């Protein structure tokens, strides 16, 4: 697809029938870290206007931990995982109660969906989330999504919901992604640094960010930084979805296509939901290392990974789990869904189809990763 102009990207966003909006904890809280009802009400009002004009809106909202640590008597966000999870369990209900009141003023119902990273790994769970979101939107509800911080493992970090928002945009076939943060745009360097300039338009987020300095650290009440927001914009861009990044007070103008924040152009036409899931949603559980011949065939775009071209297998995974396909150098070539359990694959390595049938049985005469379940990276 040809690269659209900045004006064209902003028109795409303004014309979007389905919009996913992500807001971080720092955009919903007071300087003390407590939830700020006025900020939440202002955001709900901006989203309600889109919904009342016939648009479909999904909100990916952080803030459960930020909403909970004040009522529990903490002065600041807890740092240990167990206390964070307990705080999120208290805060999520408080957060949703505020949203229900705020949207209720406009006669709009909201529905809560809590997701863990595990829900993006198994295709069945992924499809269940997809169906639930579709039905909520059909019913005129504004789904409010958050990572299930009270159950999530691995230090409760999905990227402050940034990557999750891009995956949700794929799930609901959104035509725009809006990332709301505590700065008004992307800058060439930290905004406080002399000479820093606002970046109004990024035509190709994959190629054009080498000269932009970003920080991986987030605020004291959140977990994400600009790095995770750029990753979300990248996922959206290669999924055919335009993105705008700005501060929460600019939510309304951003969705109307006004010249605020930073817009990121889509760099590919939209792919299938299944292939987008394989490529972005599912965290690989292991790695299959391939020889040069298999690597060349995979790079060609339409080849399955056969056991004859596989050299090594690493990790513990089951058939159907996502895996990396790597060259001997360690370069990631593709992601795919494994056709066999990891414990079955070592005996298959290097064998052609005839050998697999003869020595292991006909049930093993199949690709390690079928081409329909493989996405180049």
UniProtKB/Swiss-Prot annotation:
GO terms for biological process?
L-proline biosynthetic process
Major localisation: cytoplasm
Gene3D superfamilies hit by this protein: Acetylglutamate kinase-like, PUA domain
Transmembrane found in the keyword field? no
Pfam families of this UniProt entry?
AA_kinase, PUA
Q: Which InterPro entries does UniProt cross-reference here? A: AceGlu_kinase-like_sf (IPR036393), Asp/Glu/Uridylate_kinase (IPR001048), G5K_ProB (IPR041739), Glu/AcGlu_kinase (IPR001057), Glu_5kinase (IPR011529), Glu_5kinase/COase_Synthase (IPR005715), Glutamate_5-kinase_CS (IPR019797), PUA (IPR002478)
Residues of the PUA domain: 285-363
Q: Which family does it belong to?
A: Belongs to the glutamate 5-kinase family.
Role according to the record? Catalyzes the transfer of a phosphate group to glutamate to form L-glutamate 5-phosphate.
This chain's protein is named Glutamate 5-kinase
Q: Which gene encodes it?
A: proB
